[in-house]
């Protein structure tokens, strides 16, 4: 694993970061550009950014080296060779280098609303895992965003006339408390680091997508008494459309492993943040 620490810009040399935003990235530098633009627009600005790259792309490295010169946040970059789905391994590595007491997890295909980090931070509670939803952008809108880098295409009125899915999740009600208590998504959740360490982080037995990076985390956090709180209509993010492979086999393999984990009933995984 390579870990690169980019120096702080002068704007944040005096800041004490207590929040770490962990971004799981895979190849798409064009998506990363849009994410960074959305980070620069954040209303809450006292956080560090950790790029957790499941690859060792020279393009990503070059992008981050260029970006850190004027970027108003500390950036850390960790990477690993692209040897299949190893997201949980990567996320545990990211947790180890995170300086923040509070961790926010997103994926590298999601543009953030300007209030995204603030919404997570203002709703943070010691024994609560906060989880949001996402707006599913249609292919045409995603392509426009990649080409133009213009966030005007994210306005509700423009999206209203597209094939974007879950558009209701783009509506922001800052004081709304959702009734939903299940459904953590790995692309949009936050929790205190000490709680993630208490369950020994992400279970690296999951070597296929689905379940391991969110559903299993939800299960084990609940077992140690952490309450789940949905932040729908806050912590808004927009998922960029991209091709995906058929996931029938992933659902089967990951689902069967998850069922075994449920039967074991353990809150602390053996093959996680610390190897037991």
Stretches found by the model and what they are:
Residues 103:
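Short aromatic/hydrophobic "clamp" motif used to bind/position activated sugar donors
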């Amino acid at each position: 694993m390579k870990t690169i620490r980019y120096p702080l810009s002068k704007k944040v040399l005096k800041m004490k970061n207590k929040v770490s935003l962990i971004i799981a990235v895979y190849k798409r530098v064009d998506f990363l550009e849009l994410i960074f633009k959305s980070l620069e627009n954040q209303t809450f600005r006292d956080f560090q950014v950790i790029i957790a790259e499941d690859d060792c792309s020279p393009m990503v490295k070059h992008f981050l080296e260029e970006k850190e010169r004027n970027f108003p946040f500390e950036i850390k970059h960790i990477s690993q060779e692209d040897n299949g789905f190893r997201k949980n391994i990567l996320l545990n590595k990211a947790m180890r280098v995170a300086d923040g007491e509070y961790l926010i997890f997103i994926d590298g295909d999601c543009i953030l609303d300007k209030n995204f980090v603030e919404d997570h931070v203002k709703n943070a509670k010691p024994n609560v895992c906060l989880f949001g939803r996402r707006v599913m952008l249609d292919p045409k809108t995603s392509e426009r965003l990649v080409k133009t880098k213009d966030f005007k295409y994210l306005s509700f009125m423009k999206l209203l006339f597209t094939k974007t899915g879950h558009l209701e999740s783009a509506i922001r009600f800052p004081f709304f408390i959702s009734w939903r208590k299940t459904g953590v998504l790995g692309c949009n959740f936050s929790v205190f680091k000490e709680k993630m360490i208490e369950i020994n982080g992400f279970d690296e037995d999951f070597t296929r997508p689905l379940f391991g990076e969110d559903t299993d985390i939800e299960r084990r956090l609940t077992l140690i008494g952490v309450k789940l709180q949905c932040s729908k209509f806050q912590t808004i993010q927009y998922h960029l459309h991209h091709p995906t492979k058929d996931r029938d086999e992933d659902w089967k393999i990951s689902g069967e492993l998850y069922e075994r984990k449920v039967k074991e009933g353990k809150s602390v995984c053996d093959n996680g943040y610390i190897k037991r």
